[in-house]
């Protein structure tokens, strides 16, 4: 649906984004991860057609987006900026109506009423934006982002600074957008949030360090391993495991870490070898690596390069 091809953006001599290539499909939550200044917001703004790339292209449904047809892209994209950007003196209804008019909606009043009902804002319709809590302001900003029913939704730090309940509501909305077959691009520092809802992850530090599903990134960086806890000293069983076809084994006190092609499939054979050589097994579990482990390894590898 939406793709970036060798996308680059420079501000003077500073490179904000370099040679980023990726595709975003319908029904996908695509998470952009990276430290501050990595180019996440700049990437979102290029995808939204708000700034032009210094090099590379944005494609929408196979067609290149440029100066002549940027409006076509904007009509199909909803962008939530990190700051809600509401007019404090206007009411909730007036804020939404202003954007309905800017988008040229045919029935702006009806669209705004539907949106306020959907987002639970009807009872705050006549409240000035300045009087709203941060969570409510974010809810209004999300309603505004989706007012023109975009296919592609770009969210810049949508849960930043929100209380846990408000953040949960935003996550539920994002998942609902995926179910509705919209393409969602999410920029965030919240790795737990990404772990919960993202279908694919891109780690960005000016350039793309990796793009894949969380599980595929884990497998690529750490492989598949079994963690086996035994009674006594685990190192005594390393020779038997290597002879039995498991050459990559590490022992630490009473714990073995064993590389496998498929942890679940290889578990019976590992257990068989250990039991045959007298091991008293306490537990056998696949090793789990968090998305934080993936992220930190990629950032460290890039820093060493």
Sequence positions of predicted segments:
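Conserved catalytic motifs of ABC-family nucleotide-binding domains
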Residues: 149
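Helix-to-loop junction immediately C-terminal to a conserved catalytic motif
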Residues: 48
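Catalytic Walker B motif of ABC-type/P-loop ATPase nucleotide-binding domains
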Residues: 153-156
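ABC transporter nucleotide-binding domain
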Residues: 171-261
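Conserved ABC transporter NBD signature motif
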Residues: 56-66, 72-73
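Conserved ABC ATPase "signature" region
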Residues: 97, 101-124
